[in-house]
């Protein structure tokens, strides 16, 4: 159950710490990021920023030059379903097209993230939540003052994955392209166990956040 009233951080820290949040699928990462946002943080979601770029005419133009006119609809918007068909296959050609897509979106997304972080710091916001897929592998560790890694016990995690329809083979393919979670935990500032209720997780997040803000 959600708590009746969200608790807020009323006093900004002297600086604006950047907290990277990572975790395997169904580990509670979005719940943590959303709760941190409710406590006064600026949530920067790289996936959402990247998706928003697909409405940019310059990006659509670059994608057309790579993948052809078929990805553009009659109203000049991008056909995301056609683009997905091109880049999310299992063959090497699809993988190559995905790398091309990432080569267009990732630099733009990084630039926007850097701009939003600078804005948050200039406005002396209490803290920033940096939510980036493959945050450690993508070179964002030095951007963060802290990295929080969500951890779920194996049995509970399997239940959560099954309940949300995750495909085991797809999960294994994803895992093969990134650091092991043991390595990620070692590279993180804090490992947060999500093995209780959602309310317990929120309380734990609040405690960890208080520790971060008090140290700044």
From Swiss-Prot:
One of its GO terms (biological process) is coenzyme A biosynthetic process. InterPro entries: Depp_CoAkinase, P-loop_NTPase. Keywords: ATP-binding, Coenzyme A biosynthesis, Cytoplasm, Kinase, Nucleotide-binding, Transferase. It is found in: Cytoplasm. Residues 18-216 form the DPCK domain. GO terms for molecular function: ATP binding; dephospho-CoA kinase activity. One of its GO terms (cellular component) is cytoplasm. Pathway: Cofactor biosynthesis; coenzyme A biosynthesis; CoA from (R)-pantothenate: step 5/5. It comes from the Bacteria. It catalyses: 3'-dephospho-CoA + ATP = ADP + CoA + H(+). Its EC number is 2.7.1.24. ATP binds at residues 26-31. Pfam families: CoaE. Catalyzes the phosphorylation of the 3'-hydroxyl group of dephosphocoenzyme A to form coenzyme A. Belongs to the CoaE family. HAMAP family: Dephospho_CoA_kinase. This is Dephospho-CoA kinase. It comes from Rhodopirellula baltica (strain DSM 10527 / NCIMB 13988 / SH1). The gene is coaE.
